[in-house]
Amino acid sequence: MAADVEGDVYVLVEHPFEYTGKDGRRIAIQPNERYRLLRRSTEHWWHVRREPGGRPFYLPAQYVRELPALGDPAPAPQPSVPQQRPAVPEPLAYDYRFVSTPVGADGSSAEPRGRASSLCGPARQRTGGQRNSLAPGGPACLYVRPAAPVRPAQSLDDLARGGTAPPAGLLGSAGHFKASSVAGSWVCPRPLAPSDSENVYEAIPDLRCPPRAESPKQVDDPPEPVYANVERQPRATSPRSAAAPPRLSPVWETHTDTGTGRPYYYNPDTGVTTWESPFETPEGTTSPATSRASVGSGESLETEWGQYWDEESRRVFFYNPLTGETAWEDETEELEEDHQEQLEMQPSLSPRSPGQQRPPTPETDYPELLASYPEEDYSPVGSFSDPGPASPLVAPPGWSCQITPDKQMLYTNQFTQEQWVRLEDQHGKPYFYNPEDSSVQWELPQVPIPAPRSVRKSSQDSDTPAQASPPEEKIKTLDKAGVLHRTKTVDKGKRLRKKHWSTSWTVLEGGVLTFFKDSKTSAAGGLRQPSKLSTPEYTVELKGASLSWAPKDKSSKKNVLELRSRDGSEYLIQHDSEAIISTWHKAIAEGISELSADLLQGEEGEPSSADFGSSERLGSWREEDVRQNAASPSLSPGGLESDLSRVRHKLRKFLQRRPTLQSLRDKGYIKDQVFGCALAQLCERERSPVPRFVQQCIRTVEARGLDIDGLYRISGNLATIQKLRYKVDHDERLDLDDGRWEDVHVITGALKLFFRELPEPLFPFSHFHQFIAAIKLQDPAQRSRCVRDLVRTLPAPNQDTLRLLIQHLCRVIEHGEQNRMTVQNVAIVFGPTLLRPEMEEASMPMTMVFQNQVVELILHQCADIFPPH
């Protein structure tokens, strides 16, 4: 799915690639070339442009690497630590710089044997294509638990004064990054096994040791970067007590439920909460896990991670000041994503009594601490805020709940015996699934409970007002979903020329039938995760719609449904399976019947005061009068006339209060369109002799090259042309260099569509017969002179626009050997577009021949008819 790019983002080519575009351009990229990223169009192709002023093009996303974006992020706020916490040493702030390992005269490494292990070693394999290097493009480096705490070291400036300047590292002599702790943002990545790697941190005094002669080793590779810990604010670190209780992995936090007062346990790594103690504590020893946001406990300091900013790669990473472990931010996100997938594959459906519900997570129990918790620290599983039943086993009225042998909660309707299974989505939010028709919805269908109906009493019978029942809340349910073939034949009363059948993911939900654009990704996860559906292409309201089987003259396909909406649009829906289309017919028909009943009730009810500016009833006065006449035959015959006059008076006041069209235009509610607007009116509005859209199209076509084969003859994608038309009509800022309009045939098609949509063609209707009579003249000189005089009698906007268009088409004809567009071909394309009668005549084929001849003559005599200024 396409994603816009914010800011200046560049990509670096890593592999050569070459291809030929649709417009005939040859695109070639070479390694180490840099381009500006404009748009991530798809998963495999990105839209880029060479800086500065280059033409945009597409290149494969797998062949390039995205460079880090520029700009320094704002430092995170530092929350204060409560005073009552015991004072503990704060984590040291380090200045990380890239230095090289000293190499002895014999080429051996100066690294001591006791701390041997290169910083860059074989990368520990992880799933998801994780990046292990600290700097983009660097070697795969490991950051693991050291054998001993990291020791403070001397600064590099002291080393320089000592006379042993470190050599340049892999990233250059000036490559370094600063690490500043961000209090309140702590994460705990999964600890590594001791066998994964060895200590990778090296202190500055070790670098100054002389090389060992007994460990000769030929160094063929470039010097490897070594991270040196430089102490900025040295503080005495209190040693850990030997009697401290051992830390458990994974880490659990203890919280108190504000509703029940019971303590519960929360795992910040997985987001799981439980009432039961996840670990057994020895007698006389209590070691509750502390909150992730607290850094005052010396016991939990080992598992606390600080969030730091790498100025070199401009990325956030996490560092444990005691264990020496470091991790990228995306590593913790991948751990959370893996856990979310595990929760989705194995949902927790075990029965729970009201006292055994899942306890709340910290964001629910402590809402005031949400500002200090980063979003990626814990999962919101079981912490949704949507209203629901107090317990899964507490069934709504009219339903009974039981546990199946598969440990699933089955709800049964006590009246219709309808059964629904309770499941949970990836966020722990419950939803209900009907195994009979595969329908899914967030809540159980409401069971109508009989209630005493209130009788409407007139003011003549009683002064007591009738009790108004509260409006029944409508539940938006997912009635049906699947893949269907569909096409739109009529758009709001306007019949479309062609039927374009396409396959789309179709959803019937809450009385609305929605056709989505992309069916590949939606069909797989649409029922399970409705939020992943793509952008809807068509949305049809079933209220007031009609459904029937399409006759043969509408479509030759089998199993075709015809759906007509209230706004005058018509759709054809088809599926190869008769059983599937029958179920769709039943579901849509039931939805239409239910909504039609509601529509009739709404028409019989009283209209709101917002519709007519008054709370008086203006509705079904005829039925009221009929009932009153039947009840009291002695009613005055003038009562009906008075009601009619009252309604007429109310309607007149309502129409008089309507704003004028000009006032709506002045306020910006109505914007005049470009397509379909009169040429003179459009030029006057834009204050230009030629419409701006025509000028933009001509400039863009000539800039991209007039040697493209079939220019103005090959049709562009109709859907893209309609999108461009919508963009022109609703947005004043039009950029034809955007990647969406890369195909030049889309621009030429939009230009031809603009001239076809004119209310009056470029050659006005009043001049049509005169041009036809002039082209029929036998004398060539007289014919040319007559056509030239007629062109000069055209209105000024028509004449200026025709001049610009004809001169552009002449330049297209000059490249006829490459684009194969001769004078005859161009005349055939633009003849019926520029010159047409007001009413279609019987001799239409013969008239079309004369139309083409008129345009062909103007193209030949362009220099004479339109002399240069």
UniProtKB/Swiss-Prot annotation:
Native species: Mus musculus (Mouse)
Record PROSITE patterns: PH_DOMAIN, RHOGAP, SH3, WW_DOMAIN_2
Annotated membrane topology: Peripheral membrane protein
Assembly notes: Interacts with SH3KBP1/CIN85.
Low complexity bias (residue ranges): 235-250
Protein's cellular compartments: Cytoplasm; Membrane
One Pfam match: PH
Name of this protein: Rho GTPase-activating protein 27
